[in-house]
């Protein structure tokens, strides 16, 4: 386990432990966050606890040709129940991701400090959001880090059925059109698996991340 201080430094991802934890400490300075994502590392920790930096093996990703859109979801998309926008209200999206209640979780890992840091990355054009609207009301969305050829998804929320799925599918289709290589989903999630995401070796993920 590496301990981070003020220096902008991360150890090789191969040094992560079996759970995927690579380092502890440091801060959420935008420059550190940018270095982290470019290095295949992301922060994930509970509010009030030290910052943990992760580089899990395997890594959950979506290759766009493997995106699964069910028949029922296609009907919803075709009915145009929702309106999808990009980067129209980043702060409201990340705030909703913080506040939404999730099954099996007592609290949130998205602290106010994280919101401030990612909003700064949004101002720099690096953190981006997808918004899903119904009758002019924000009902779903997601946010993440855009590396230009890989998009690192961070969190999503849904206030009505299928809103977060709509955000995810819309983003995947957009990234495919723009010739991105993959959508990074970080760790296994059965919901994401149903949409076509799968786990790959960290070595393969890093190879794709470092190629442009």
From Swiss-Prot:
Gene Ontology process terms (BP): protein catabolic process
Top EC category: transferase
Transmembrane keyword on record: no
Location relative to the cell: Cytoplasm
One Gene Ontology molecular-function label: leucyl-tRNA--protein transferase activity
Cytoplasm in keyword set: yes
Any one Gene Ontology cellular component term annotated for this protein: cytoplasm
The protein's Enzyme Commission number: 2.3.2.6
Gene3D superfamilies: Leucyl/phenylalanyl-tRNA-protein transferase, C-terminal domain (3.40.630.70), Leucyl/phenylalanyl-tRNA-protein transferase, N-terminal domain (3.30.70.3550)
Protein keywords: Acyltransferase, Cytoplasm, Transferase
Recorded catalytic activity of this chain's protein: N-terminal L-lysyl-[protein] + L-leucyl-tRNA(Leu) = N-terminal L-leucyl-L-lysyl-[protein] + tRNA(Leu) + H(+); N-terminal L-arginyl-[protein] + L-leucyl-tRNA(Leu) = N-terminal L-leucyl-L-arginyl-[protein] + tRNA(Leu) + H(+); L-phenylalanyl-tRNA(Phe) + an N-terminal L-alpha-aminoacyl-[protein] = an N-terminal L-phenylalanyl-L-alpha-aminoacyl-[protein] + tRNA(Phe)
InterPro entries named in the record: Acyl_CoA_acyltransferase, Leu/Phe-tRNA_Trfase, Leu/Phe-tRNA_Trfase_C, Leu/Phe-tRNA_Trfase_N
Transmembrane segments: none
Function: Functions in the N-end rule pathway of protein degradation where it conjugates Leu, Phe and, less efficiently, Met from aminoacyl-tRNAs to the N-termini of proteins containing an N-terminal arginine or lysine.
Family stated for the protein in its record: Belongs to the L/F-transferase family.
Protein name (Swiss-Prot/TrEMBL): Leucyl/phenylalanyl-tRNA--protein transferase
Gene that this sequence comes from: aat
